[in-house]
Swiss-Prot record:
Record PROSITE patterns: SWIB_MDM2
Name of the protein in its database record: SWI/SNF-related matrix-associated actin-dependent regulator of chromatin subfamily D member 1
Chain's role: Involved in transcriptional activation and repression of select genes by chromatin remodeling (alteration of DNA-nucleosome topology). Component of SWI/SNF chromatin remodeling complexes that carry out key enzymatic activities, changing chromatin structure by altering DNA-histone contacts within a nucleosome in an ATP-dependent manner. Belongs to the neural progenitors-specific chromatin remodeling complex (npBAF complex) and the neuron-specific chromatin remodeling complex (nBAF complex).
Name of the gene this protein is made from: SMARCD1
Organism: Bos taurus (Bovine)
Keyword Phosphoprotein attached: yes
């Protein structure tokens, strides 16, 4: 029978139906000698008989090695009516290879996904290979060597750009900061009282306090910064508190607070307005918004490491450097640290694991101190506006980091490169087609008769592949073709298949179930 996908082909002695061309079969005489040729009629709807699967000892002439013929009728059963073996008596039963069974649907899906991935991977490889001119074209057109040199240079350039992109990606994983000056302006204005003689009503005296600021421009970066949006003043801080004189404004109205939330909208400054006609002392507390977060160290640990406020990774790195410098690591158990007298006072332990240091540091780290500015709100009418300036150091993202991000996210150049690559691939494909046409015409010009014969043979092979035709029709049309040894077994298989088919039809008609 014909081999199904995923199964091993088993050659039973019973057989499949007939198909194919005309011819004659040999009748068997006494002793198994061939008798005179007997003309066989075709099966209903079929041509003359064609063996579904010749035995291994009798290969059919004109067939390609490994090819199989289409089976006819149901699968073979036993020659008797009560047995269940799948082969005829007297023949050895072939076992099916378990590894060749039909795979489960999940396995089929996995295989299909893997095939898609392999096709995508091969497509990328093929896309690179498609840009290379064949050696034959380079021999015919010497100028094509210039193109190959450019292609080699492009590969080197692509490798260099890829390395740079990887370096930039690694650099962006680390915080890139630069110190800039943040100038804070604190100013106040005084509005004296006004009386309205007609209505008998007026306005009371009041003052207004403004807190605003900006980053000082860097001459080297001013040209680049002019093209990007400026940061709002409030974006530098986590919270702001203005504390007024408690004796003047009472315990419930002397504090003005602002705290950042998830829905906070950034602003360029803060202003506070209160009634009053006397000078007011106020304290402005600014809590910087450190990114990444920074912590103030315990005074003892700060003196030991020489760090006042820093991020957690920097603090752990500094502590590790102190341990290595003073050789405090246990020589036998390297994961332990032997504390000296200073670390014993800080961590209250003589020996600890290095993995315990982050947890032990948690109790020694505190929120950073706020920036405290004392200011006097003047209500002197002669001094309508009084401004004080304060400069503080602020760590901001390096402008180079923004340029790096822009470079990595830029797709304009990639689209242009992809467009040019497509044009190159189309040009190379056209060149290959012209090369094939040239070789076709050149072969015909050198030997027209031999070329036509070879071409017809090639077309004949292609036709057989396209139409799924097997065998050799020229041999099958001759009577000698059916006098070969394989015809005896083919006849038995054909008639046995027909008997089994009629038997099943009869059982279905009579309602007989074969148990």
């Amino acid at each position: 029978m014909a081999a199904r996908a995923g199964f091993q082909s088993v050659a039973p002695s019973g057989g499949a139906g007939a198909s194919g061309g005309a011819g004659a079969a040999a009748a068997l005489g006494p002793g198994g000698t061939p008798g005179p040729p007997v003309r066989m009629g075709p099966a209903p709807g079929q041509g003359l008989y064609r063996s579904p699967m010749p035995g291994a000892a009798y290969p059919r002439p004109g067939m390609l090695p490994g090819s199989r013929m289409t089976p006819q009728g149901p699968s073979m059963g036993p020659p008797g009516y009560g047995g269940n073996p799948s082969v005829r008596p007297g023949l050895a039963q072939s076992g099916m290879d378990q590894s060749l069974k039909r795979p489960a649907p999940q396995q089929i899906k996995q295989v299909q996904q893997q095939a898609v991935q392999n096709r995508n991977h091969n497509a990328k490889k093929k896309k690179m290979a498609d840009k290379i001119l064949p050696q034959r074209i380079r021999e015919l057109v010497p100028e094509s060597q210039d193109y190959m040199d450019l292609l080699a240079f492009e590969r080197k350039l692509d490798q260099t750009i890829m390395r740079k992109r990887l370096d930039i990606q690694e650099a962006l994983k680390r915080p890139i900061k630069q110190k800039r000056k943040l100038r804070i302006f604190i100013s106040n204005t005084f509005n004296p009282a006004k009386s309205d003689a007609e209505d008998g009503e007026g306005t009371v005296a009041s003052w207004e306090l403004r807190v605003e600021g900006r980053l000082l421009e860097d001459s080297a970066l001013s040209k680049y910064d002019a093209t990007k949006q400026k940061r709002k003043f409030s974006s530098f801080f986590k919270s702001l508190v203005i504390e007024l004189d408690k004796d003047l404004y009472g315990p419930d109205n002397h504090l003005v607070e602002w705290h950042r939330t998830a829905t906070t909208q950034e602003t360029d400054g803060f202003q506070v307005k209160r009634p009053g006609d006397v000078n007011v002392r106020c304290t402005v507390l600014l809590m910087l918004d450190y990114q990444p977060p920074q912590f103030k160290l315990d005074p003892r640990l700060a003196r030991l490491l020489g760090i006042h406020t820093q991020t957690r990774p920097v603090i752990i790195q500094a502590l590790w450097q102190y341990i290595k410098t003073h050789k405090l690591q246990d020589p036998h158990e390297r994961e332990f640290v032997i504390c000296d007298k200073y670390l014993q006072q800080i961590f209250e332990s003589q020996r600890m694991k290095f993995s315990e240091i982050p947890q032990r540091l948690h109790a020694l780290l505190m929120p950073p101190e706020p920036i405290i500015i004392n200011h006097v709100i003047s209500v002197d009418p002669n001094d309508q506006k009084k401004t004080a300036c304060y400069d503080i150091d602020e760590e901001v993202d390096d402008t180079l980091k923004t340029q790096m991000n822009s470079f990595l996210l830029s797709t304009a150049s990639q689209q242009e490169i992809a467009t040019l690559d497509n044009k190159i691939h189309e040009t190379i494909e056209t060149i290959n087609q012209l090369k094939t046409q040239r070789e076709f015409m050149l072969s015909f010009a050198r030997d027209p008769q031999g070329f036509i014969n070879d071409w017809l043979q090639s077309q004949c092979r292609d036709l057989k592949v396209m139409t799924d035709v097997v065998g050799n029709s020229e041999e099958e049309r001759r009577a000698e073709f059916y006098f070969q040894p394989w015809a005896q077994e083919a006849v038995c298989r054909y008639f046995y298949s027909k008997v089994q088919q009629r038997r099943q039809e009869l059982e279905q008609a009579l309602g007989i179930r074969n148990t």
